[in-house]
Amino acid sequence: MDLNKFTERAKGFVQNAQSVAIRENHQRLLPEHLLKALIDDDQGLAASLISNSEGNVDEIALFLNSLLEKQVKVKGNVQPFADPSFLKVLDEAETLAQKSGDQFVATERLLTALAMVKSGAKEALLSAGMTSQKINSSINEMRKGRTADSASAEDNYQALEKYAQDLTHAAREGKIDPIIGRD
């Protein structure tokens, strides 16, 4: 596993997962921490993939919180160590990226790997009806044939939806004022 093959956002999520483990005083860095970091993302890529796959993000979050509360807590200034299941998720994500023709491991591949590797995170995803196949179909729909060929690949996904307004959709819903005086 080479973290240099991960996109900037994917690296950030791995670091966020470690921060979650430290904040919760957990001894081990688990796939559940990574899934929590993905779901709590302010840009919501993982949450939108889950929603597009007809999954319930709130249900996953509740299940995750109950799993994380059961983890062993340690006192003091202890760095959590990476659990073998966490490392397996990262390896699986790298394998998935290679199979799909990506040069970098993107965030969505981390989510797919979480749905594949046996862990509490997989149980949380399954509790909301999420499978790796559903996530993959959502990824293919979102990417529209593009691959992750740069360290900032996720920034290009759904750029139009992020930075533009769909005036036709807004007009159909009656959210814009009618144009008066049109010739």
Task: List each language-model region with its residue ranges.
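Histone-fold recognition with a strong bias for associated Lys/Arg-rich disordered tails
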Residues: 1-183
